[in-house]
């Protein structure tokens, strides 16, 4: 298989003993993570958006299949997903919390992809917390849909392109963790 076609699946089962449980959160977690090997030149928003569209297409096909199997399931997902950055959400809803911004925009659009999560916004606060040593805050996204049964914005997927050396250094510095930075020269 060529580069970009290599996938790695991780299946995690965990107990989150401190989780606050509700309709969508439980103490037991069955989480599937997928990793795709990409080329350096694919570290960009266009590649991320194409990946989001592929995942969203699968979600819509699953919804359609379930609606055929069970006649009481209504189709609620729109044909297309709407992309928006956390900064654009803040500009649209400056007086609301990040979760309220997601709710209002998801309710208006049906399915949204919130991008660029983790860095500080104009108000000095991040939209949501993200580890500085995992995804590149400029190249990550959450797929969120409006779920009318519970009248909520429901996150279905969180994804991102991993940090490279430059993004790692910048994000560790912004997170106040420069002590975690090292180079291969320092290890000698």
Question: Where do the PLM segments sit?
Answer:
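A generic structural motif
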Residues: 33-44
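Alpha-helical scaffold segments that mediate packing/assembly in large oligomeric complexes
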Residues: 60-96
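Short acidic/polar capping segments at secondary-structure boundaries
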Residues: 16, 39-41, 118-120
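Long, well-ordered alpha-helical scaffolding segments within enzyme catalytic domains
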Residues: 46-63
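Short, small-residue-biased leader/transition segments that mark boundaries at the very start
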Residues: 2-7, 185-188
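Active-site scaffold segments
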Residues: 31-35, 181-184
């Amino acid at each position: 298989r060529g580069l970009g076609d290599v996938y790695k699946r991780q299946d995690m089962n965990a107990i989150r003993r401190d989780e606050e449980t509700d309709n969508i959160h439980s103490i037991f977690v069955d989480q599937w993570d997928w990793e795709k090997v990409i080329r350096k030149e694919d570290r960009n928003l266009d590649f991320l958006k194409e990946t989001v569209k592929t995942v969203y297409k699968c979600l819509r096909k699953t919804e359609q299949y379930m609606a055929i199997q069970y006649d009481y399931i209504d189709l609620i997902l729109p044909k297309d997903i709407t992309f928006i950055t956390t900064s654009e959400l803040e500009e649209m809803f400056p007086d609301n919390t990040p979760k309220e911004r997601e709710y209002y925009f998801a309710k208006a659009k049906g399915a949204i992809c919130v991008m660029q999560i983790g860095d500080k916004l104009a108000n000095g606060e991040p939209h949501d917390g993200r580890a500085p040593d995992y995804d590149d805050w400029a190249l990550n996204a959450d797929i969120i849909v409006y779920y009318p049964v519970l009248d909520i914005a429901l996150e279905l997927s969180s994804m991102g392109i991993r940090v490279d050396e430059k993004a790692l250094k910048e994000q560790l510095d912004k997170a106040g963790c420069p002590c975690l930075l090292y180079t291969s020269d320092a290890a000698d």
